[in-house]
Amino acid sequence: LAGRLLIGPWRRAAWRILERFAAADPGLREQLQAKAKGCWAKAAPETALQIALSAGCFDRDDKLALLAPLANRYVDIPLMRDAVLSSLQDEEYAFLLQLSKDEQWAQQQLPRQIFFEMLAAAVARKGDAEELTALLERLDRPESSYGWQDKALLNGLATQALQSKARAVTLAKRPDLLARADQYGPALEKNIELLAQLFIWPGKEVVQAAEKSQLLDAEGLQAFAK
């Protein structure tokens, strides 16, 4: 019955309804995963969008395997980019790695650049120190070797650094990339410097405390002078 509903005239509604039960029903989830794998390529864009949204309840590997071709075909549609991102559910870093290795994503296109920025920002919001350190290490190389993906990742991280009000991610030490920011051109240097707002490391807290102490001392002297 589920299979017939998913390809019938009520298919979009069927996907929405069945995904609610699939999260707690492994058998139904397996059926949905198989049906999505077999029908997404021939589905109308509206149905493909719903399949992308429903993929949030899929098992990790099936989810990533399905969302990659969907993102590749429909990356120029903002709603699809949002749908894929919402279904990744903390798997943005793994998805980023997957797309980075995909030859279909080697060529630069503005929608792809936007999507990479969205993925990088999502990784920053998640705040996993290991994932963020890996991204910083990827970006820590000469500017001449930067490709469009690297610049998009840096833009996404820097944008999130400007907007984020979340607690800073604790690192074991200051990232080497931040220490070498002045070795890059003005645009990249500015974005790299912004990344410092995402992190805290031994020594950074001391500097901030010292700056705050100096400010308080200055205010105290002004009050005493009055």
Predicted regions and their residues:
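Long, ordered, helix-rich scaffold segments
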Residues: L1-K226
